[in-house]
Amino acid sequence: MSAKSRILVLNGPNINLLGLREPGHYGHQTLPQIVDTLTQQAQTAGIELEHLQSNREYELIEAIHAAHGNVDFIIINPAAFTHTSVALRDALLGVAIPFIEVHLSNVHAREPFRHHSYLSDKALGVICGLGAQGYEFALSAAIARLQAK
């Protein structure tokens, strides 16, 4: 693994409201707190971490496109786009960067429309229902994959 390894963390719509929005489902941690924890974890491993949260699908797609040749791994919480976005799926397939899908809540224990993901069958792995800690597990897995190269 080179010291230049980079991981991109993408968060979809309404994740900017963490700590306020439905804490019973999503917890009390804010997005900046989660990103700070991940940044420290990545720095300890000698990995550069980038983060983007957007409520706009096209901004997430553009970030995925820009990652091609610049990022070694993606961790994505597509949020509501999980269940609707063929475009995000196509972008991830187009750049062929390995990715892990993360969800704070257990989407399979919620409304039926949340049970389908357009990304899960293409992800290296899916972590759901573990709250903010799910991001840490995803980052640990990504780092392990990069270190194994």
UniProtKB/Swiss-Prot annotation:
InterPro entries: DHquinase_II, DHquinase_II_CS, DHquinase_II_sf. Substrate binds at residues 77, 83, 90, 104-105, 114. The active site is at residues 26, 103. The record marks 21 as: Transition state stabilizer. Keywords: Amino-acid biosynthesis, Aromatic amino acid biosynthesis, Lyase. One of its GO terms (biological process) is aromatic amino acid family biosynthetic process. The keyword Lyase applies. Its EC number is 4.2.1.10. Pathway: Metabolic intermediate biosynthesis; chorismate biosynthesis; chorismate from D-erythrose 4-phosphate and phosphoenolpyruvate: step 3/7. It holds the Pfam family DHquinase_II. PROSITE patterns: DEHYDROQUINASE_II. The keyword Amino-acid biosynthesis applies. It catalyses: 3-dehydroquinate = 3-dehydroshikimate + H2O. GO terms for molecular function: 3-dehydroquinate dehydratase activity. Homododecamer. Catalyzes a trans-dehydration via an enolate intermediate. Belongs to the type-II 3-dehydroquinase family. This is 3-dehydroquinate dehydratase. The lineage of its organism: Bacteria, Pseudomonadati, Pseudomonadota, Gammaproteobacteria, Vibrionales.
